[in-house]
Amino acid sequence: MGLRLPFFRAGLVGALVSSSAAAQSFVREPLPLAPGARVLTITEPGPFTEPGIAIDPRDNRRAVGVYQNQATAAWTADAGATWKTADGTIPPNYRVAGDVSVAVDRHGHAFVGYIAFDHTGVTSYWALGGTRGGLFVRRSDDGGATWAKEPSVVVEHPETKPNLPWEDMPSIVADTRERSPYVGNVYIGWIRYQVDRTVMLFSRSTDDGRTWSTPKVISTEPGLPRDDTGGLVGFRAAVADDGTLYATWSDGRGVVFTTSRDGGKTFTASRRVIETAPPYFNIASFSRGNGFPNIAIEPKSHRLYVSWGDYRNGDIDIFVATSADRGRTWSKPTRVNDDPPHNGKDQFMQWMTVDPADGSAYVVFYDRRGDSTNVRPIVVLARSTDGGRSFTNYAWTDVSFDPRESSFLGDYNGLAALNGRVYGIWPEEAQTPAKVENGRRGRNTIIRVGVAEFPLKR
């Protein structure tokens, strides 16, 4: 879980806050800029982390971005030139919300999934002894501008009791494939922390997100009860043209994989398919890094991609493996970042997507190759047009930033692509002094959105 107390409702901008490179003293490291690259800041400085983004499959000028503090949504209808912050996504009955994710269905309905609660658990471990809470989904019928008055409940623990399970890190996905027999289904998976274990849960909606099935355990083997000592973490899913649902997560030692071919009713036994280093690791100048896997699919060919980060080379790199046989076998890992191996420079917090229009695979990540001190990252976008065998790296941000004031940027970012247009969303440490209130320095991160324009591969 990426939430860090204390939480507060910051004053959010209702429209675009443009970035100012003049206030920063570092220049872009020598990578080519992504084609048509634009990067905008959509929040004021505050406690903002863990964003996600989704594109309207009918129109790639329209997209919805989400992030915490709380469960906040912003939307664009002009290919990311301007963004507006939506009202009505914050849960009314709980003190805190977060771990937000977003999907958009074939009709342009947007879905935001998030957890909500009053307090985390004991100081020694946040998931133990927490208060009442649950997992909720809110729907927008107009591309993110307005949201349903009441959220739908996936699972809820309405009263604080000893040893309540903790629902964490939901990830939501919509079946938008016109040839799928389950088109219109919406799926959500998440971690449940219990006193003695972690398990991966799943629920589905067949009525446009209004109601949700009883949660089911889809992890064949449970994990340890803490995320930083071998717990299960990072449910992610992708849908093929025929409606097959593929899902991954980390079990602390590798990528775990499972499949549903009946619209989320049943799943194959989950199994580890790729060996990796543990997903949580220390990174200089950060509180921690997270390398848990992300899955994407080229829907027509069924080629599966899994990306992750680990330190097998002595510093942190980004890797991708692919499967051409629906997950039965997997390729050897391809190193995505193209700086020299073993150079002591970290790349981390990857996210992946595949453009369904042409099968191009994209990975976004923080990259510190250009800083001799291995502190200041830029944001890099990598593209593969050969089925994941190689990646071209592009700079998406003009300048690096210093993360040391905040040190915590969350556990994940967001990426989406359609018809050559790529949207990314990530937090950065604002390069202006943090506000001090009541003698305490406030959190000072901002949410940024990048757009790039690539020609479709032939």
Model-assigned labels for residue ranges:
Residues R9-S19:
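Bacterial N-terminal signal peptides
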Residues Q24-R458:
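Extracellular, repeat-based ectodomains that mediate carbohydrate processing or recognition
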